[in-house]
Amino acid sequence: RSVVILEGNRFLNQPDMRASERVREMYFSSAALVRDGGVCILIQESGHPIVTALTSWNPSMATHQDLQERLELSLPPYVRVATVSMESGEIVRLKGSLQKAIDESRLPSHTRLLGPVTIGEKSTLILTVPVADGQSLIATLHEFMRRRSAAKKALPSLRIDPYSLSH
């Protein structure tokens, strides 16, 4: 039995930081179906690390490349991430409050506030901190949620270390 994987670049051009993970799993799972005498044909840009990893049957090679890129870009698993989604006007106030907490050292100085990104009437703020400072960020966000709940205000959507950062 042989396997043909078409349009490899399309799989990797998804706006999701986990795309390469899924592609690596799909490629190696598909290639594992090849039987004696069969071939695996991959239609993919030849310079991509996944091609070298698949050719040498070494998935750790592609994983290592992925992790190196994430380290350089300060992405998970090297940082903790939280996303907060709520009404657009409120997210601006929340971002201001979080920036003030950073300035006053109530949140780690390495906390990054990304966004907000607005879709419709809701906006999402992405927060990242080094793994070592993750508990401080999470405690602050849980306190924010507790206070909103006590004040009977609408609770935002809070995701800690979400699987995906895209909507």
Give, region by region, the residue ranges found by the protein language model.
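Accessory helical-bundle/CTD segments and flexible terminal tails appended to RecA-like ATPase motors
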Residues: 1-18, 32-167
